[in-house]
A protein has these predicted regions:
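N-terminal domain-onset segments
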Residues: 1-66, 104-117
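Short, compact, well-ordered microdomains
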Residues: 71-116
Length: 117
C-alpha cells in the first residue's frame, strides 16, 4: 500500500492523549510535521507515522502507551502508540479483538486504561 495522507483529527487527539499519558513530550506543531501511512485497507486502522520528508520503513519499535475503547458494535479495540529507537513517533496500532472492521474512534474521554504488555 503506497497511500499516504494527513493524520485524521481523531488520530491526532488519540496520539496526543497517549503521549501525554506516557509523559512523552511531542514537538511543537507535530501533527503538521508527520504523515500517516495506512497499514490496513480499512478506513480506520493502524497507521505508520513519518515526517514529511521521510519514507515509512519497518524498523525496531516499542510501545510507549496504550488504551482501549468499545466500538459502536460494543467490541473492544486496543490502541498502542509506538516509538522507534530514536524516540520518534512510529505507529498508532489498532487491534479490534474480533478482527472486524473498526467503525469509529470515540473522543479521548471514552478511552480506558489497559495493562501494558
Amino acid at each position: 500500500m503506497e497511500y499516504k495522507r494527513k493524520i485524521f483529527p481523531e488520530e491526532v487527539a488519540l496520539i496526543a492523549f497517549l503521549a501525554s499519558k506516557a509523559q512523552f513530550l511531542l514537538e511543537s506543531n507535530w501533527e503538521n510535521k508527520f504523515i500517516a501511512y495506512p497499514l490496513t485497507k480499512e478506513k480506520i486502522g493502524s497507521i505508520g507515522l513519518f515526517k514529511n520528508n521521510q519514507k515509512y520503513t519497518r524498523r525496531q519499535s516499542r510501545v510507549l502507551s496504550c488504551c482501549k475503547f468499545h466500538d459502536v458494535d460494543n467490541v473492544e479495540v486496543a490502541v498502542y502508540l509506538l516509538i522507534d529507537s530514536n524516540d520518534t513517533l512510529y505507529e498508532l496500532d489498532f487491534w479490534k479483538v474480533d478482527d472486524s472492521e473498526i467503525c469509529h474512534i470515540p473522543s479521548v474521554d471514552s478511552m480506558e486504561d489497559i495493562p501494558q504488555i
